[in-house]
C-alpha cells in the first residue's frame, strides 16, 4: 500500500488529464500564457510524481504574445496509443485547437498540428476505439443559437491521424446533465464493458462546478445521463469548506481493475484563492454500470490508501518546498516566465551557478515577455527567498522578487536607484494602479542582497538582508488583492525573480544565486 496526499499537485495545476502507458502514469495541466507551456508529470504509484518536462517548450509551439494572463493554453488532454503520446489542447490566443505528438513523453514534442475552423470550441479530447480509429471530442456553442452564457454542447467527429484532419460528419452527443446547464466542458470519452462513457464538467469552474457522466452503446448517437448526475461536486459543502470548486475529471485504470479520477479543486484561505485550481485524486468504484467517486465519503479526502507498491523519484514534486539552483545549462523545469522565455533576457553561462537577468525595457506590469522567472505558490503559510547581486546604474533599473497574479495585480520587492543611493522599494500594483508601500535606503554600489517574503494566510512581512544585517522592511501587507477572486482570471500566483529597465535602454543585469519557497 502507498499513501497519496491531496492535492497530488500543489499550486495552480488546473484541468488535469491523465493517461497510463504500461506501469507509468502521466498528467498534464493547463498553463495559459506561462512559458514553457503544459507541464507534464510522471508517476508509477499515483502518489509520488516527478516533473519530466514541459510539452510546449519552444516559441513556435506557444504563440501567445500580447495575451491576457488567462488566455493561451486551455485544458490539455494526454493520451497514449500504439507507441505514441498525443497531447491535444486549445490555444485561445492563436490558432485554436491543435495536437502535438511524441514517442518519449519527456520530449521533444512535435510542432502543432492545427485543426482549424473544422474544430471550433475549447477543451478538446481524443478517444481511440477498439478498431484503432481516433475520434475528436470537443465543445462548441449551441449551433441553433446561444440562448444564454454557457449554452454549449459536446460533439464528436472522426480524426484522420495520418492527415491530422477531421473527416466525416460531426455530431452533438450531449449538452450536460442538468436542465439549463452552463458550460458543459472538459469532455473525455472511454469505452468500458461495451459502453461508451462521456465524463465532463459542468456548472462553470467556480462554486457550481461538478462532474457528470453519460453513456451510450454507440458513439454517434445521443447519450443517456447517469441518474445520479452530477456524480461529484463540492458545491453542496459551502464556500467555507477547505476544498471548493471540484470538477473537470479524467478517469484512469491501473491495469488491475482499480479506477481513479484526477480533477481540479481549489483550497481557499479567508474566502480567497491565491493558488488557483490544483490537482486532486479520488478513488472510483462501479455500481450498476456507473462510476461512484469517493464511495462512502462523497468528497475529496486528504489522504488515500492505494493498493500498489510505493515508487519514489530522486527529484519528486513537493507540496511544501522548492529549492532552485542555477548550475544547469537550462532553466529548472519548475521555472516559468510570462508569454515566452526569451534567451536575450537571461544567461546561465556568464556566471556559472548564477541566473543572470538582464534589465530589459519590458516590465512585468505590461503584457510583454519580460525578465522574470517564477514558480507556483503552493501554500498559504510559507516564505520565499532569493539571493541577488545587483547595482542599479540608472533610476529606471530595478531587480528583485515579485508575487505575481497578473500584470495588473502583483507585489514587487525591488532594489532601485534614488540619486546616488540604493533603495529597497515595495510596490503594490492593484488593478493597474501602483502604490509604494515602503522604501528604505539600501547602501551604495554593487551589493549582495537577500530578499525574504514571509506569508501567513493572507498577510505578508518582507525582510531585507545585507552586510550581515537583517531589516524588517514591511509587515501586515494584505495579499487579498492577488487572489483569483479579487484579480479575476483562471490562474494562481507565481513568485519569482525579476529585472527591468522600465521602458528605457539598459545593458545592466542582476545575478541571482538561488530561489527558495518553503512551507512554514
Residue ranges of each PLM-predicted region?
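Carbohydrate-active catalytic/glycan-binding domains of CAZyme proteins
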Residues: 1-520
Amino acid at each position: 500500500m502507498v499513501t497519496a496526499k491531496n492535492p497530488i499537485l500543489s499550486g495552480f495545476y488546473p484541468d488535469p488529464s491523465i493517461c497510463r502507458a504500461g506501469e507509468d502514469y502521466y498528467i498534464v495541466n493547463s498553463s495559459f500564457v506561462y512559458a514553457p507551456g503544459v507541464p507534464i508529470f510522471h508517476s508509477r504509484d499515483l502518489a509520488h510524481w516527478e516533473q519530466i518536462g514541459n510539452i510546449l517548450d519552444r516559441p513556435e509551439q506557444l504563440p501567445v504574445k500580447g495575451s491576457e494572463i488567462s488566455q493561451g493554453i486551455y485544458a490539455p488532454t494526454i493520451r497514449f496509443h500504439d507507441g505514441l503520446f498525443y497531447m491535444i489542447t486549445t490555444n485561445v490566443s492563436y490558432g485554436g485547437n491543435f495536437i502535438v505528438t511524441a514517442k518519449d513523453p519527456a520530449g521533444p514534442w512535435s510542432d502543432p498540428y492545427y485543426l482549424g475552423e473544422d474544430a471550433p470550441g475549447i477543451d478538446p479530447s481524443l478517444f481511440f476505439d477498439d478498431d484503432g480509429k481516433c475520434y475528436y471530442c470537443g465543445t462548441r456553442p449551441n449551433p441553433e443559437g446561444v440562448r444564454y452564457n454557457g449554452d454549449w454542447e459536446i460533439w464528436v467527429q472522426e480524426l484522420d491521424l495520418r492527415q491530422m484532419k477531421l473527416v466525416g460528419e460531426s455530431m452533438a452527443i450531449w449538452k450536460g446533465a442538468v436542465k439549463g446547464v452552463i458550460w458543459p466542458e472538459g469532455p473525455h470519452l472511454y469505452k468500458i464493458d461495451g459502453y461508451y462513457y462521456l465524463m465532463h464538467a459542468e456548472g462553470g469552474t467556480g462554486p457550481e462546478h461538478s462532474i457528470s457522466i453519460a453513456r451510450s452503446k454507440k458513439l454517434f448517437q445521443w447519450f443517456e445521463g447517469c441518474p445520479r448526475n452530477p456524480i461529484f461536486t463540492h458545491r453542496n459543502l459551502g464556500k467555507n469548506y477547505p476544498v471548493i470548486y471540484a470538477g473537470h475529471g479524467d478517469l484512469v485504470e491501473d491495469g488491475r481493475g482499480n479506477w481513479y479520477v484526477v480533477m481540479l479543486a481549489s483550497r481557499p484561505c479567508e474566502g480567497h484563492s491565491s493558488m488557483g485550481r490544483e490537482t486532486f485524486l479520488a478513488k472510483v468504484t462501479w455500481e450498476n454500470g456507473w462510476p461512484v467517486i469517493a464511495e462512502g465519503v462523497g468528497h475529496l479526502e486528504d489522504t488515500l490508501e492505494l493498493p500498489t507498491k510505493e515508487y519514489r523519484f530522486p527529484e519528486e514534486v513537493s507540496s511544501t518546498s522548492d529549492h532552485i539552483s542555477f548550475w544547469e545549462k537550462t532553466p529548472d523545469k519548475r521555472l516559468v516566465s510570462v508569454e515566452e522565455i526569451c534567451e536575450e533576457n537571461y544567461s546561465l553561462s556568464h556566471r556559472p551557478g548564477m541566473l543572470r537577468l538582464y534589465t530589459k525595457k519590458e516590465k512585468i506590469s505590461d503584457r510583454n515577455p519580460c525578465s522574470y522567472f517564477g514558480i507556483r505558490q503552493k501554500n498559504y503559510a510559507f516564505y520565499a527567498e532569493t539571493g541577488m547581486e545587483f547595482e542599479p546604474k540608472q533610476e529606471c533599473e530595478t531587480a528583485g522578487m515579485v508575487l505575481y497574479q497578473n500584470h495588473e495585480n502583483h507585489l514587487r520587492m525591488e532594489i532601485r536607484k534614488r540619486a546616488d543611493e540604493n533603495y529597497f522599494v515595495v510596490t503594490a500594483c492593484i488593478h493597474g494602479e501602483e502604490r509604494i508601500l515602503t522604501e528604505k535606503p539600501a547602501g551604495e554600489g554593487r551589493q549582495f542582497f537577500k530578499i525574504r517574503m514571509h506569508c501567513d494566510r493572507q498577510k505578508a512581512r518582507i525582510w531585507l538582508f545585507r552586510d550581515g544585517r537583517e531589516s524588517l522592511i514591511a509587515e501586515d501587507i494584505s495579499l487579498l488583492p492577488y487572489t483569483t477572486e479579487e484579480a479575476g482570471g483562471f490562474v494562481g500566483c507565481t513568485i519569482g525573480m525579476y529585472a527591468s529597465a522600465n521602458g528605457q535602454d539598459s545593458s545592466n543585469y542582476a545575478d541571482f544565486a538561488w530561489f527558495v519557497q518553503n512551507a512554514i
